[in-house]
Amino acid sequence: MNLIKCYQTNSSWYKGAKRNSTPVGILWHATAAGNPTLKRYVQPMETDANYQEMITLLGKNKYGNDWNHIEHEAGLNAWIGQLADGSIATIQAGEWTTTPWGCGAGSKGSCNGYIKTSSSRTYNGQHWVQFEICDDGYKDKQYFDKVY
């Protein structure tokens, strides 16, 4: 596995996330967007020491709609998808012990680290590591086999 760190430090998720949470499971999800490129969701900050290296690896998101912005409250521990050269990689977007915010909640709580109590939610100090797969619209079996 090609694991690359590119923490999304400018996102509201990263800035407000609980740290030192205990991972108790893994949740994977697909974007369902028909776009396999990691650059759509992951971009470094221009102030990052390795900014140019990361842009070369990922490619530049020319629309600026990646998740490393203050207005994106959602955030995940990792993304799996295509680099600029077409190869597959996993981008770690936050520490494994950082509570993600990538799924909803139900009557029993959430994989985001919260349990439901009557009319509110309470942080329980545990979470499921969450990663998102940048799907290609489920058109290419070879791509599917590589990312899953």
Describe the residue ranges of each PLM region.
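Active-site-adjacent loop/helix surface patches within enzyme catalytic domains
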Residues: M1-Y148
